[in-house]
Amino acid sequence: MNKIKFLDRSLVQKIAAGEAIDRPCSILRELLDNSIDSGADKIEVFLEEGGIRRILITDNGSGISKEDLKICYLPHTTSKINEEKDLEKIQTLGFRGEALSSIAICSNLTITSSTTGEDSYQIEVENGTEKYFKKQSAINGTIVDVTNLFHNFPARKRFLKKDSIETKMCLKVFEEKAVTHPGIDFKLSLNNELRKVYFKESLINRVQSVYGEIIENNKFGKIETEYENVQMKIFFAPPNFSRKDRRNIKIFLNRRPVEEHNLSEAIIDGHSRILTNRNFPICYLFLEIDPRYVDFNIHPQKKEVRFFNLPFLPKQVSSNINEFFDRERKEILQDYHNIIIKRQITNDAHLLHPEDDPTNSDFQTYEIIQNESLILDKPQNNKITNIIEDKVKFESQNPIQKDKPSFKSYIQNILLETSTIANDFQKPIAKHEFKYRGQLFSEFLIVEKDNEVFFIDQHALHEKIIYQTLINSEKITQKLLIPIEFQVDCEDTDKILASELEEYKKLDIIVTKIKEQTYQLESIPNICNKYENVIIQFFKTRKSKTIDSLETDLYATIACRQAVKCNDTISSEFSQFLINEFFNLKLKYCPHGRKIYHKISKFELEKSVNRK
């Protein structure tokens, strides 16, 4: 007796339907694709009970003719392709001819459509079989009504989540379609209540409309570029809005959401200079690629894609993001450098022309070289460590008094001895009007400003100030008196480290490979003195990231060790210095990606106690 048998036709259809349709959001995705492919510029979605009870979609697209309506629900019927070579130039979202037939098998399906704006026709299909076909009053476009999902698939229905979770999944699909088609009006109603409305707008505005709440309505950064056969647009959140998972890394290829590991890693790699391994960016990558170079026909729900002859793509994504943040960082560091120099000149002007000095002289120019030596020792007794580089020209109408300390010496004393700078901290450049209300839990600084209360993490803030100074300082190669030998345990780490030896030299770090998995550290930057172990530990845990992460991670670690800690009690003068730096530099996040502060408005506070 034969063991191999032909399956019943209805069973074959159920198996096929189970591959394409696994929950309500799958149906919503397929129906939205059909509406978009029809050329509609207005689409409305109605969901009941997370789509399990009902999914209704209306559009004003080209519609379905009477003849096509009679066969559209049958397996492998499609208007998108005609022959095999059409698979190489797919421009539409749908193309397999499986969606409507799968939906018709596992639910009750009713379609009403018109191509003329006059007579329309309606077909109802139950369990894959036509129930009726009739003429209806005129409509403009198409209405698709799906009810009682999986009523004949009890096993599949048991695996559905509760309504609220299925609703969230449907909302995710709706947002993905809305964000990739900004030229279409979208509306979404949940249980007869209008919840989402998006009107026609530009892509950046649509991204802001759909995902802006994630970053508290701050503005997304934008990169737009074009290569041969590829158009690339990248939108990303400010780095202080990082996440602990990858859920907000989204990739859209030819207006389809796809899951592509190499591109996701490229986005993470592009943010590696500003985010740590424990944090992930909020980033949306939009790619438009000639259909000849991509293949979507490898996944039942078209979530995966295969590229042809585009090996440069991940590297370009990473490089574009890196270059953007490089420019941003240089601007921030230059602002920081200018503020430091300007504050010193302003605060210490009384050393050069005291008010009580009647002496007058001709206009003179002085050139002052500041801090040739780099000071990085742990501050003791609430001392501050700051590093000031370069030369500045100072103009004065009075000469320096001989019985007063030099300008350079006085600056060094100010920066290193907190106990002697109470008055100077009260006179910074661009002094912000704020009220320092004290230290909370020996961890937070409480500040009142413009009807808002700020709770500032003292360690994160001080850490960021030191980090920005370190990253902007001049580095000099310092040869170790006795080279340090170390080993790496992993072969992959060995290969990565060996391939990057020349790159480390650009950071004034010289490391030599002695034998397999054995290296020797010979030189380091002068600012890393006493931190050889930090560098070696970094080598031992090296992963496939850009070389710039070494500089970022290393200086973040040093800054972390130098900064005041949680449970440190600090003086009021030092606190106010940190606070003024916070407002001057507009600092939002520490080198490790954590938020530096939390704020609450007077209105919010009053509202919480029912005063508003």
From Swiss-Prot:
Signal peptide feature range: none
SMART domains associated with the record: DNA_mis_repair (SM01340), MutL_C (SM00853)
GO terms under biological process: mismatch repair
Similarity comment text for this entry: Belongs to the DNA mismatch repair MutL/HexB family.
Key words of the record: DNA damage, DNA repair
GO molecular function, one term: ATP binding
Protein name listed in UniProt: DNA mismatch repair protein MutL
Record organism: Borrelia turicatae (strain 91E135)
PANTHER family: DNA MISMATCH REPAIR PROTEIN MLH, PMS, MUTL, DNA MISMATCH REPAIR PROTEIN MLH1
